[in-house]
């Protein structure tokens, strides 16, 4: 990539210094003036990585310019014919051109950083294979610049909720030759994924919505006499609902190793179909989609599930993932010229210990395991009973191979906390509900020919399918109790779920939250104000709401400075000085508070005449009926400096204009920073570590329940699966944005009425910055697909929380964990699962496991490892250290 891509102004600098230039050149600063400590280490790390990433960016950009002739462009008519076919086996094979660039590497090697660079240097659609992967990428991108939310690849190509239960592989197509040509492989994948693809295709072409946005832009160009394509970008400014695939031909998929091999063709198919249907400029130019697959083929498995209705069993099997398919399939490998379109990232930057990093490379690339490696892993082994005892390793994350083991540990942990007398970690239970429609259930029994099927049995078999996340099986849940409401046509199944107060949790899906306060220390709140992190993360819809909210917290929280001065043991002289300085600061920022400053300078120490504050000018006497004697005694008894005149002289209103909103925030922020500086000067570290709590209204606690006077003044936001939260309790306080959101959902009439009457509590969480929020309930609808019939069966309502105290190894993929204790199974031990589990830790000092997997009998995928080792020796493959 040219230097101008990284340093846009460099070329202009060279021009100004060329021979004959009249411009005076400022001499550079002497070398001795340069201080390398002025820059953080991250700056140097980014520059050392740039050399390796530049060729990756340049090659992907080169692939994105590739075009095919008009004869090679898939015609729109071919896509329109597909829904009319009786069977997908009748599909006429057609070559759908595409390019692939593969980015692989071991855990923590910088693959996500490469995605960040691609996002900043070119127009591309960034996606994740799963919701967790998508949100991990979003977290990475938003840490540097404001970015739109990242969708999964399924959301981008048109996958919908009713496709979850689709029966994949219902039709099978066998290629007629070996090795098969690319169009034969593509037909095989389309036939395999037919139930989903035909529904997406039919839905697109049967839609009455206009798809002439690009035609309108081209007509406008002709009308204005502009060059073709000069106004194309306006289409995305005026039509926000345009598919992202019509904007660019570069599609990036993070954690692509979790996808089955057929998804490569599915993405290519949908890209061509959407661009053909919308007649996009890149379709007219014959541009070819570039699928950038990011991940590790040795870390992950692609899993497919199939539910057998007759026996009520869910069968899960592993299938060839898309990365392995690209690397090992001869036809695909040669078609995409893999050697010149592959970058391998090496070195684990998550855990930077040399010996441990070498061990990770051995597991990643299938290198020979030596006795030295085994002895290193021996140092991490402790008895399994030690890991499974909740009294040991408090605060560590347990990793298990199955949901059943996670649930068993959570039940053991809760039982331990109930008898331990622990005050910080208190156990409490809340109900979760599943609403089953009786008419749909009766129809299901009829279609599946199971007239005697009981609802209890069906619920037990479908517990993991009814909810919208697999971690629901990790919970410590009680026995399900069913209640029939005949008038509503609904059966309500209630299950009590146990939670731990003050434990670390994460949300299980992207959920709505309502931020209403802050709970932390003076130091952490000061850091939030200086960093503007809240504005960047919470002000996604309108920054004014975020500033209004912070102004509310600042105004409510100022009293904390005065509360600190009432602590016993403080030096009285410094306390008086703090009162005096705060009074002067308040008088400076709020002119009406100047009376306080003069009172604080009164050497006599006489009480301030509060009655005089309300007397008109020139008033010398009169009746005292305007003042209640009790109030007079209260005010007169206070030392004149102990009253925060901010609350006496400043009327807190909610401004409307942007200028007024920011002016109010700036004044209150200046006052907070000024007071913070005064207290740091007088009290130092004792002050900055003191608690600072502020909310939009008064709150109180009763056990694990939190009572809030009003939520007015809070701000609505989004909770992501990648965020870490502390569970602070629950509340039944009404949150009107949640009520409005529920009203907009098209729920079954009986379910909506029953759920509305339950007044289901909502969880209160504190994020890593200290902000307190109410989390909306997690409501998911379950649609069953049986023999081409879709049945709207049930609606599940729970709290959408997953504990970070224990999880499955598969769930931990992509996470960085501080302290990890792993329980590996003694049978069916796979090295790729071992690698995923061990590579989660940021330091091997905080890693424990129940056995040494290298000394146990295990399975190892040597085929893919051999291909990766061959690639490392291939000079055409880009290696990034």
Swiss-Prot record:
Highest taxon of source: Viruses
One Pfam family from the record: Herpes_Helicase
GO CC, any one term: host cell nucleus
Binding annotation for ATP: 105-112
One Gene Ontology term of the molecular function aspect: helicase activity
Subcellular location per the Swiss-Prot or TrEMBL entry: Host nucleus
Cross-referenced InterPro entries: DNA_helicase_dom, HSV_HELI, P-loop_NTPase
Keywords of this entry: ATP-binding, DNA replication, Helicase, Host nucleus, Hydrolase, Nucleotide-binding
The protein's Enzyme Commission number: 3.6.4.-
HAMAP family xrefs: HSV_HELI
Protein name stated in the entry: DNA replication helicase
The species this protein was found in: Equine herpesvirus 1 (strain V592) (EHV-1)
Gene name of this polypeptide: HELI
């Amino acid at each position: 990539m040219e230097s101008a891509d990284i340093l846009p102004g460099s070329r202009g600098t060279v021009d100004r210094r060329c021979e004959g230039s009249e411009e005076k050149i400022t001499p550079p600063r002497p070398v001795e003036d340069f201080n390398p400590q002025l820059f953080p280490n991250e700056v140097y790390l980014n520059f050392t990585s740039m050399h390796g990433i530049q060729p990756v960016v340049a090659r992907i950009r080169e692939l994105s310019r590739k075009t095919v002739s008009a004869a090679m462009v898939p015609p729109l008519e071919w896509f329109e014919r597909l829904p009319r076919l009786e069977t997908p086996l009748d599909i006429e094979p057609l070559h759908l051109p595409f390019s692939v660039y593969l980015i692989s590497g071991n855990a923590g090697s910088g693959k996500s950083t490469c995605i960040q660079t691609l996002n900043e240097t070119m127009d591309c659609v960034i996606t994740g294979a799963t919701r967790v992967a998508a949100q991990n990428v979003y977290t990475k991108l938003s840490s540097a610049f404001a970015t739109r939310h990242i969708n999964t690849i399924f959301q981008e190509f048109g996958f919908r909720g009713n496709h979850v239960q689709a029966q994949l592989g219902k039709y099978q197509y066998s290629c007629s030759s070996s090795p098969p040509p690319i169009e034969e492989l593509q037909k095989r994948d389309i036939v395999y994924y037919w139930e989903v693809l035909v529904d997406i295709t039919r839905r697109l072409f049967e839609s009455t919505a206009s798809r002439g946005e690009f035609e309108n832009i081209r007509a406008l160009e002709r009308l204005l006499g502009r060059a073709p394509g000069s106004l194309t970008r306006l289409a995305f400014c005026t039509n926000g609902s345009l598919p992202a695939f019509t904007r660019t031909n570069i599609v990036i998929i993070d954690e692509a190793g979790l996808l089955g091999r057929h998804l490569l063709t599915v993405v290519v198919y949908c890209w061509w179909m959407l661009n053909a249907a919308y007649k996009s400029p890149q379709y007219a130019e014959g541009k070819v989609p570039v699928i950038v697959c990011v991940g590790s083929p040795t870390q992950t498995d692609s899993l497919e599930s199939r539910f057998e209705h007759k026996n009520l069993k869910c069968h899960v099997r592993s299938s060839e993932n898309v990365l392995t398919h690209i690397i090992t399939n001869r036809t695909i490998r040669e078609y995409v010229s893999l050697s010149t379109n592959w970058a391998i990232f090496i070195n684990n930057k998550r855990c930077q210990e040399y010996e441990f990093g070498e061990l990770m490379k051995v597991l990643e690339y299938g290198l020979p395991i030596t006795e030295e490696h085994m002895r290193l892993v021996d140092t991490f082994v402790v008895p399994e009973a030690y890991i499974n005892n909740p009294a040991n390793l408090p605060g560590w994350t347990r990793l298990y191979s199955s949901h059943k083991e996670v649930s068993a540990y959570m039940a053991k942990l809760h039982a331990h906390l109930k008898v331990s007398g622990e005050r910080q970690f208190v156990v409490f239970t809340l109900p979760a509900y599943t609403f089953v429609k009786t008419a749909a259930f009766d129809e299901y029994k009829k279609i599946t020919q199971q007239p005697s099927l009981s609802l209890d049995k069906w619920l037990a078999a479908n517990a993991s399918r009814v909810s919208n996340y697999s971690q629901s099986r990790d919970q410590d849940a009680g026995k399900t109790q069913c209640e029939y409401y005949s008038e509503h046509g609904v059966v309500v199944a209630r299950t009590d779920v146990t939670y731990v107060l003050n434990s670390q949790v994460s949300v299980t899906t992207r959920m709505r939250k309502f931020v209403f306060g802050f709970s932390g220390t003076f130091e952490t709140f000061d850091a939030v104000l200086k960093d503007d992190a809240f504005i960047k993360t919470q002000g996604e819809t309108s920054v004014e709401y975020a500033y209004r909210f912070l102004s509310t917290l600042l105004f409510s929280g100022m009293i904390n400075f005065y509360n600190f001065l009432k602590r016993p043991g403080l030096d009285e002289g410094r306390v008086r000085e703090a009162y005096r300085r705060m009074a002067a600061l308040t008088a400076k920022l709020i002119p009406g508070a100047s009376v306080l400053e003069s009172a604080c300078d009164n050497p006599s120490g006489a009480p301030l005449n509060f009655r005089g504050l309300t007397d008109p000018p020139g008033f010398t006497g009169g009746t005292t009926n305007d003042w209640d004697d009790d109030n007079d005694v209260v005010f007169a008894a206070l030392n004149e400096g102990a009253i925060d005149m901010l609350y006496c002289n400043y009327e807190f209103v909610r401004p409307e204009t942007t200028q007024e909103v920011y002016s109010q925030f700036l004044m209150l922020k200046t006052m907070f920073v000024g007071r913070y500086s005064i207290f740091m000067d007088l009290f130092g570290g004792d002050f900055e570590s003191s608690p600072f709590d502020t909310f939009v209204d008064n709150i109180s606690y009763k056990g694990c329940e939190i009572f809030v006077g009003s939520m007015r003044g809070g701000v609505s936001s989004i909770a992501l699966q990648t965020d870490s939260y502390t569970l602070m309790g629950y509340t039944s306080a009404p949150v009107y944005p949640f009520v409005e959101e529920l009203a907009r959902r098209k729920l079954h009439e009986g379910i909506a009425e029953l759920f509305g009457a339950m007044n289901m509590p909502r969880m209160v969480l504190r994020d890593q910055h200290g902000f307190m929020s109410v989390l909306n309930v997690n409501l998911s609808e379950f649609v069953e697909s049986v023999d081409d019939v879709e049945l709207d069966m049930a609606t599940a309502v729970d709290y959408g929380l997953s504990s970070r105290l224990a999880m499955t190894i598969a769930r931990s993929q992509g996470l960085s964990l501080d302290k990890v204790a792993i329980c590996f199974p003694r049978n069916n031990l796979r090295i790729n699962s071992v690698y995923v589990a061990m590579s989660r830790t940021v330091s091997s000092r905080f890693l424990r496991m129940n056995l040494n997997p290298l000394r146990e009998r295990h399975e190892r995928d040597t085929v893919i490892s051999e291909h990766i080792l061959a690639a490392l020796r291939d000079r055409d493959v880009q290696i990034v250290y």
